[in-house]
């Protein structure tokens, strides 16, 4: 674990090999380690459980439909049609259903963190 600016940076590995880099002040991904083939197509969304391997994730679907079904602690992956090279990750609160605590944007090919939206 590495400490930067008062928070710890670590990595956890889910069964099956998917890994998530996280900050100790919450499961805010600081790098996205989701295989590109498991990302939703541009214009689509996918509910993602950070503790599950890629092959055990729910299928992608319509963003309007999926946005209302994200369980606490899960993420909603979004690929905007006008930003094909980006993945938006909405991180949902682990205790409060429907509450998004952060939206982070990543490069779809490298998984590199790009920006945080407010």
Predicted features by range, described:
Residues 3-118:
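Peripheral, non-catalytic segments of secretory and membrane proteins
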């Amino acid at each position: 674990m590495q400490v930067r600016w008062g928070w710890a940076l670590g990595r956890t590995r889910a069964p099956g090999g998917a890994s998530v880099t996280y900050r100790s002040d919450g499961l805010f991904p600081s790098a996205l380690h989701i295989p590109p083939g498991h990302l939703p197509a541009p214009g689509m969304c996918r509910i993602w459980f950070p503790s599950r391997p890629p092959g055990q994730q729910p299928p992608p679907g319509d963003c309007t439909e999926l946005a209302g079904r994200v369980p606490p602690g899960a993420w909603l992956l979004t690929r905007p049609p006008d930003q094909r090279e980006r993945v938006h990750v909405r991180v949902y609160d682990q205790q409060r259903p429907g509450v998004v605590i952060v939206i982070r944007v990543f490069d779809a090919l490298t998984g590199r963190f790009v920006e945080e939206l407010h």
